Design a protein with these regions (language model features):
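TPR alpha-solenoid repeat register
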Residues: 31, 65, 99, 130-131
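Short coil turns that delineate tetratricopeptide repeat
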Residues: 26-27, 60-61, 125-126
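Structural register within alpha-helical repeat arrays
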Residues: 1, 34-38, 69, 76, ...
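Short coil/linker segments at helix-helix boundaries
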Residues: 78-117
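Residue at a conserved register position within TPR or TPR-like alpha-solenoid repeats
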Residues: 5, 39, 73, 80, ...
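Conserved structural position within tetratricopeptide repeats
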Residues: 19-23, 53-57, 116, 122-123, ...
Length: 155
């Protein structure tokens, strides 16, 4: 029934049913992956982090959990990068430049984390979507050669 709710995109019903599933079944990677998807759709990010961590302990190559982390770190880095660059371009002062540099200290490690997850995903399944993300990440990390390589793979 839980899987049926997921397939039919009844996220709230799937979420309610989860508590009724036997504890042993709650350690099944397939069910946990489904529950991660439910939490993602319901925008329960803290729950997603906990579930993804639990799934990766059981299956280090689980696509759903790896995608969660890859996207999480990518968008965290990208959104901060864009907002700080926009602020700096609007007001090119020493203080704004210092703020940009401080933000980049957070941005680059998150891009690297995302890169590592996307590289693993790409190795498992060389999707164009993963290659495009890798191209974007390598562009931000100023590695033009690798960015170009992955952009070509994305076409």
């Amino acid at each position: 029934l839980f899987e049926t709710y997921i397939e039919s995109e009844n996220w709230d019903l799937a979420n309610k049913l989860w508590t009724e599933i036997e504890p042993q079944a709650q350690n099944d990677v397939k069910l946990l992956s489904g529950y991660l998807l439910v939490n993602k759709k319901l925008e329960n990010n803290a729950g997603c982090d906990k579930l993804a961590q639990q799934i990766i302990k059981l299956d280090a190559s689980n696509i759903t959990a790896l995608e969660w982390y890859a996207e999480k770190y990518y968008w965290k880095a990208e959104n901060l990068y864009l907002s700080e660059m926009k602020a700096y371009k609007a007001k090119r002062t020493n203080s704004q430049y210092s703020r940009l540099l401080k933000a980049l200290e957070q941005v680059y490690p998150d891009f690297r984390k995302s890169r590592d997850y996307y590289l693993k995903l790409y190795k498992i399944d060389p999707k164009k979507e993963y290659a495009n993300y890798l191209g974007n990440i390598f562009t931000r990390l100023d590695d033009k050669e690798k960015a170009e390589y992955y952009y070509k793979k994305a076409k």
